[in-house]
Amino acid sequence: MKTAITIAGTDSSGGAGIQADIKTMITNGVYAMSAITALTAQNTTGVTSILNATPEFLGQELDSIFTDIYLDCLLYT
């Protein structure tokens, strides 16, 4: 099975961001992983709030994946 990681923010409504990327990957038979750059409070009408991940935390997320799992694809949005 092919593997991929999405590096993006969340979308609490599920229509974009990591949630949408993971749905797309799974639909296409890809093992999906993620590194979260920001948490958002949003719905279909707009974004209420954004909490950005620190560069250090993002680095820890990526190190955790890269030291354990071979990646076939990286999606950065």
Language model features with spans:
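Conserved small/polar residues in nucleotide/adenosyl-binding loops
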Residues: Y76-T77
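Small-residue (G/A/S/T)-rich helix-start motifs and N-terminal tracts that mark the onset
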Residues: M1-D72
